[in-house]
Amino acid sequence: MNTWKKELSFIFVLLLVAALTACGSTNEETNGEQSGAGTEVSEEEITIAQINWAENIAVTNMWKVILEDKGYDVTLSLLDMGVTMEALATSEIDLSLEIWLPVQDANYLETYEDTINFSESTWFDNAKVGLVVPTYLEEVNSVEDLNEHKELFDGEIIGFDSGAGTMEVTEQLIEDYNLEFELLPSSEPAMIAAIGQAIENEEPIVSPLWSPHSVFSNYDLKFLDDPQKTFGGVEKIHHASRLGFEEDHPEVSEWLKNWKMDDEEIGELIDYVESAEDPLDGAKEWIEENQELIGEWVK
């Protein structure tokens, strides 16, 4: 049973290698481009953290295109969430475009509220987080059902990046519900691959997941009820910047505050980025087709 689990570690390694080359412009690529252009640092350089999550890859590439069209030199630096927060706090990077509040990233807000500027503005207002299972598991509809079906899942919740706020909340959920389960970290691509493999074999799997996410277009999944509201209700997505960024780049800061997307817009952007051979090309195509929306942000 659960034959996909034997392949999970191998999938994780392959996807981690692929992520370093498939997530658009990275720090390594940009450094290579700059090495032949001298060592002078432009005041218009901006470094944005990129996390290997579908929506994060989409919006970071989107903003790279938008800002470079405006004359900025943008580097996307591939990091995990914990390193991103530390890098913002020490001003090693300028921006993180994905902070989920009030629940998922509350721990980061509490830890870094004096050393990072967490914007009150939001760019997505209808996000949801929880545990998901395939819809064919008709007997499992609530987190409270999991212990009863522990053997079905081998007592495992298949997770993603260990430093992510949602993973920390999932650990809290295990405690709140006294679940006899272990949370297994991997990466988002490895987790999605595991979900796909399980569904292909009509096997059980339970994982923490969030919406918006393109996986819901590919597989029939359902969120489990969370009576204790450990995952909270509706989440909103903010951005964060290093201290002093607003003073250094007031125009960009204003554009980010104007940034708003709905389910259809972010879903379409993710589709364009994931369908393109180069994520940056997908972002460019989407931007070309949504000039009116972009104009509302950068006015």
Predicted regions and their residues:
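C-terminal motif of bacterial Sec signal peptides marking the signal peptidase cleavage site
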Residues: 18-22
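Short, low-complexity, disordered segments immediately C-terminal to signal peptides
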Residues: 24-43
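Short, well-ordered beta-strand elements
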Residues: 40-55, 72-77, 154-158, 256
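Short helix-initiation/N-cap motifs at beta->coil->alpha
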Residues: 53-54, 75-87, 184-194
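Pocket-flanking alpha-helical
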Residues: 60, 80-114, 193-194, 214-219
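Ligand-binding pocket segment of bilobal, Venus flytrap-like solute-binding proteins
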Residues: 93-97, 162-229
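A conserved helix-loop-strand patch within extracytoplasmic ligand-binding domains
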Residues: 114-162
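A bilobed periplasmic-binding-protein/Venus flytrap-type ligand-binding module shared by bacterial periplasmic
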Residues: 128-138, 235-248
